[in-house]
């Protein structure tokens, strides 16, 4: 089948995307939904289950936005208008209507990158610039890393001279240049200005980082970077017969992540007596009701999976550069005077929470190099706090939560906080928390990807023992992670690896999300 361009897909499916009376789909989502429609249509053309007469009859009275009485030949205008063309021959258009109704409501469209797959497997490629002549050497460090600064001596003095790495108990010599790798910012070069011994107890990375920062604050160590002398550069060019003076080199590598489609499936069985009585007493069709139940449950479960993966992979917030000294990492406690900065009343303590959210958003930008956090997933109580506080630079007012929707029977989208954060309610949160995340203007610019393959496949049969009707639904999709999500990994891993989240590549490592638990509300 010929691969259609984005414009061709939008033009083909425009009547269904923009059909009168259908829920509106934002312009930014239409190209993605059109691709999902195209994948669904491709499945119609090859799978026999869509031609099952009983399923077709059930669907004929099920969907109002794509109600059918016949085969529309996949004409998007007819599907959207509910026009019939004779006897029911297949249920493709009705399933398309279900997809049209359900898929755009997935929370994944707002907090994940959505990348429809053309086949059961997908690939994500990442180009990485690397220090050294062998890009795939073990431990080769990545350049242009948003979290770690450049090796500022690599093309300069560091090409001709190697500098000693600082360690516990070292005695500094005036004028000597040393090197150190900070856990949160990368390699630096430091020149000693006086004789001093490094603390002997600084025997792990965190303690050594703290000791060196202490000496920098005291002026004992000063950060420095220099180019090489002209005479050294000439020698490295092979000038005057010089040898064994190689240039420092850089290269690049292209890594691949593989994403595989997985499935969700549900079935329902009912008795003939139930179907007869339901039709006679209530005027309802058992197939139609169960179809709605199964399809809705699958979509709700995918929504939950997306939220769970984000929280699973989110870094521990209120840690590192976002931790207020003296407070507890990972937890914002309204009963802790350090967290609420000595607030006198509730409105002031609520504003302290806003500032913590801002700190987490800025940390996401520092680690990813893509942008500040721009959405929040939070428990009901936390959303109530955010809705009750004055977000302006003013006295800390506290009032009724009138600015946000906090009723999840209406929507899980609460509103926009301070003109910068889209806030979503986690209606099933087990304890109070908030997660700050980032999703950019295009679908590749996200920490996690939702990759639908075949949105919905209906199935029907009968139990061979009692002849009772059985119906089911399947959906196939993949979940992938951004190859640059683990910001702390400056040395790239293997060139071909799984792109699906797991305990090894995701747990607490995704720099696009930061989660903080909230206590004492």
UniProtKB/Swiss-Prot annotation:
Keywords: Capsid protein, Late protein, Virion. GO terms for cellular component: viral capsid. Pfam families: Gp23 (PF07068). Major capsid protein that self-associates to form hexamers, building most of the capsid in association with pentons made of the capsid vertex protein and one dodecamer of the portal protein. The major capsid protein self-associates to form 160 hexamers, building most of the T=13 laevo capsid. Folding of major capsid protein requires the assistance of two chaperones, the host chaperone groL acting with the phage encoded gp23-specific chaperone, gp31. The capsid also contains two nonessential outer capsid proteins, Hoc and Soc, which decorate the capsid surface. Belongs to the T4 phage capsid protein family. Homohexamer. Interacts with the portal protein. Interacts with the capsid vertex protein that forms pentamers. Interacts with hoc; one hoc molecule associates with each capsid hexamer. Interacts with soc; this interaction reinforces the capsid structure. A total of 960 subunits of the major capsid protein forms the 160 hexamers. This is Major capsid protein. It comes from Escherichia phage AR1 (Bacteriophage AR1).
